[in-house]
């Protein structure tokens, strides 16, 4: 079977999924963006399934968005007419940045839910949330994000990592990892941390700049509180492993979220996770951390709880969760979704 992923982004999720699919007998072509009409016609004989991931980049194009959105709708219709089977993984219910175009985003998602041959979500709560907003007659499969164990080097132990980062062995260190953007809740976290943390606590915040305003305010917070250590930009793998090895817990203080690869990264490296009770968080984390009611009070309580907790059982639970997230199993289950769509079992 031959499948095309679109759009493809520079993150490990799609590469790891493609590897799992390859071992399940599926050949994956990676399309960086919206395919042309010519590509759709030329490849129909050899490609059975178009697997859509993050839809935003297929129909949004700054000032050209009206034309890009129309092109997306035309290609979507053409793909249906040509007989491609269409699968969508709903990584989120709505994009993290709506750019004032909520009706457009909702229309695209209603279209996908109505016409895709299959939809994949990463947890049961995500399925309920998606179907409540966009009812759908066809199948909606639950397939989790796979483990990221082994993705980063594992050569540094806790003591070595802390020494290289200039961190005290006695400090309580939290880590937030991933794109720096408004939906991540990092400004709330910085404020709550500054107001409640002990003198030797440290908050590591690392990730790419995806919102200049958020980064500017975080820089100000870090300048005012030296316990907040901010790394803005690309984080090399060797540095990621130091952060993961040095941290006592991963904090994912989202304002809104469905599912999170950064949470799975933390679990994969044995870190207890602190996250709000939103989307898939409770299902992803299980006994491997603290899930809190969204808001300042809930976050403050969760930070206190994770610091005081016996984190060894949480760390063991995190690794056990990740061990059950095999990409071979996820590839096999995803291939079954494709085959059901192609066989008309939808």
Predicted feature residues:
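Donor nucleotide-sugar binding/catalytic pocket of nucleotide-sugar-dependent glycosyltransferases
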Residues: 114-153
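Acidic anion/phosphate-binding donor-loop and adjacent secondary structure
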Residues: 131-132, 147-164, 170, 182, ...
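A short, well-ordered alpha-helix in the C-terminal region of glycosyltransferases
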Residues: 160-163, 312-325
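Conserved donor-binding/catalytic core segment of Leloir-type glycosyltransferases
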Residues: 168-184, 190-193, 204
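Glycosyltransferase donor-sugar binding loop
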Residues: 202-216, 233
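Nucleotide-activated donor-binding/catalytic signature segment of Leloir-type glycosyltransferases, i.e.
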Residues: 215-241
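Acidic donor-binding loop of glycosyltransferase active sites
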Residues: 242-258, 268-271
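Conserved acidic donor-binding segment of nucleotide-sugar-dependent glycosyltransferases
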Residues: 289-297, 304-310
């Amino acid at each position: 079977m031959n499948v095309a992923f679109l759009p493809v982004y520079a993150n490990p999720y799609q590469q790891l999924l493609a590897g799992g699919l390859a071992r399940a007998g599926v050949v994956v072509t990676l399309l960086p963006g919206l395919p042309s009409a010519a590509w759709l016609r030329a490849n129909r004989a050899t490609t059975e399934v178009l697997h859509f991931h993050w839809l935003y980049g297929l129909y949004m194009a700054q000032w050209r968005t009206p034309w890009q959105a129309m092109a997306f709708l035309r290609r979507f219709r053409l793909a249906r007419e040509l007989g491609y089977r269409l699968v969508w993984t709903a990584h989120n219910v709505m994009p993290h940045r709506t750019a004032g175009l909520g009706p457009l985003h909702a229309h695209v998602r209603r279209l996908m839910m109505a016409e895709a041959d299959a939809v994949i979500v990463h947890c049961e709560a995500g399925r309920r949330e998606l179907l409540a907003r966009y009812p759908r007659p066809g199948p909606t499969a639950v397939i989790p994000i796979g483990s990221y164990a082994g993705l980063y080097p594992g050569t540094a132990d806790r003591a070595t990592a802390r020494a290289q980062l200039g961190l005290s062995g006695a400090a309580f260190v939290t880590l937030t990892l991933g794109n720096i953007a408004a939906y991540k809740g990092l400004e709330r976290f910085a404020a709550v941390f500054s107001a409640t943390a002990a003198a030797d606590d440290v908050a590591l915040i690392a990730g790419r700049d995806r919102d200049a305003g958020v980064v500017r305010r975080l820089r100000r917070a870090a300048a005012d509180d030296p316990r907040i250590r901010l790394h803005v930009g690309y984080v090399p793998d060797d540095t990621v492993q130091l952060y993961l090895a040095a941290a006592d817990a991963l904090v994912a203080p989202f304002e809104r979220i469905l599912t999170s690869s950064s949470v799975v990264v933390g679990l994969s490296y044995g870190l207890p996770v602190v996250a709000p009770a939103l989307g898939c968080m409770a299902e992803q984390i299980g006994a491997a951390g603290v899930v809190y009611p969204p808001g300042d009070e809930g976050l403050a309580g969760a930070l206190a709880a994770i610091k005081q907790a016996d984190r060894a059982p949480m760390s063991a639970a995190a690794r056990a969760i990740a061990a059950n997230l095999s990409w071979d199993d996820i590839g096999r289950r995803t291939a079954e979704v494709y085959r059901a769509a192609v066989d008309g079992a939808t």
